[in-house]
Amino acid sequence: MASEVAQGRTHEELPRVLTATNALAIVVGIIIGSGIFLVPREMMAAVGSSRMVYAVWITGGLLSLFGAMSYAEVAAMRPRVGGEYAFLHDAYGPLTAFLYTWTWTMIAKPASIATIAAGLMRVLGTFPVFAFLDRAAVGHLMWSQGLAIAATWLITGLNIVSTRDSAQVQTLLTWLKVAMIVVIAGMCFASVKYGDWHNFSSGFQGARGGFAGFMIALIAALWAYDGWSDVSQMAGEVQKPQRSLPVALIGGVTIVGALYMLTNAAIQYVLPSAAIAAADRPATDALQLVAGNLGAGLVAVGMAVSIGATFVGSSLSGARVPFAAARDRLFPSVLGQIHPRFKTPWVSLLLQAVLSSLLLLAIGKFQALFSLAIFSEWLFYALTAATVFVFRVREPDANRPYRVTGYPVVPALFILAALVLLVFSFMDRPRESTAGALVILCGVPVHYLFQRSKAPGDKASDYVEQ
């Protein structure tokens, strides 16, 4: 089934203003947020040894790379706004595309943005001037929640005003944080006084261990790698997408994997396993030991810059999904509006900010938020990666600027790993996973009610060829 927009469709489209450099920076910038600084403790506490932590980082990196390679093939074939939404619609039809859009819009992206905002407040709380963040502001509302909501709206405003300027800000912040990561790692390795290569073979008692421990650590690692798919949602705004998207997806994940391994090695060179497992902020503790308050301050600034880049990019890309669905009449048409002056999907961006703010008010906790986001995202990661097989069978002669290396093994391994993660998520965090599943299932009646409520001649099938 082809899903090209019908020829009679004449409405304005988003302009292609993003360069290949912007696309690469979006991938790197969105992935490297707070994860590398906040999850090493969770990983070490789960697996209990430096070697197992490396095994988790490598496994998570390879899975993300396999997913990026699978997405690259489809994105280069179909460089449309909405990314995964468009791929799922073309492969499986409007119901699956609606369920993805519903889940993405109502839970996955708002939970992801709320997690980023909560992580930023966690970082700012390390500065004495922000010590008040852990106190109540009004009633049960914490200052950290209030400022996280304010930051969400500030970033949303930036993204509404200009896609090009937002991308340039995000690109600048991305390369700045890459430079700071290299400097931080270099300072650790330069510390002859505190560094110890024996730390890499150390372990500690008390870790959960076993398969359960490995999976808990892997979920944390995958959250740290999360975001590599977001650039596909802006495929319709990327210049020369057939070349730019594969380079951005595969190159971005590779760069991030190298930086994560470097950072993890730097921390472990300075801190033994037991110290990492006990530390709320292992990178900060390592630099505090090496360079005192100056080092700890450098890490905090680096984390703030890092999360800022993720914040801008994640908010920028996320709103393209409901925008694309609205343009195909699968979502309320108001979400498909383009701002007459700024040429951005401003209504979708506003909705995204509202839902993210509500999640921050309702939950506000870092751990619960990333558990909520991981489940729903990985279900649709698996379905989207599977479109590689669908299109290979259905359209064997289609032009493919990039073909996934290692087909069919690479996409199959990614899909299998995603399914294992989904099962484990239900076992380890049943409440959050059940909530995610219920949101998806609620989309089925919503889809049919929405289609029935529209006037004859205004159905999605009248605008999109099946």
Task: Go through each PLM region and give its residues.
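Membrane-interface "cap" regions at the ends of multi-pass membrane proteins
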Residues: M1-R41, A45-R51, I58, S64-M69, ...
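Flexible loop linkers connecting adjacent transmembrane helices
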Residues: E4-G8, E12-L14, V53-Y54, S70-F98, ...
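Helix-loop-helix junctions that connect adjacent transmembrane segments
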Residues: G8-L14, S50-Y54, A131-W143, W175-V301, ...
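Hydrophobic transmembrane alpha-helices that form the core helical bundles
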Residues: E42, L65-T152, G157-I160, M303-A324, ...
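TM-loop-TM module centered on a large, flexible mid-protein loop between adjacent transmembrane helices
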Residues: A86-L88, G93, G125-R135, F204, ...
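Membrane-interface loop-to-helix entry segments
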Residues: L124, W143-Y194, R208, L249, ...
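Hydrophobic alpha-helical segments of multi-pass membrane transport proteins
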Residues: I181-I184, P322, A373-R400, A417-V420, ...
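C-terminal membrane-solvent junction of multi-pass transporters and transport-like membrane proteins
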Residues: V334-W346, Y381-E432, S453, E465
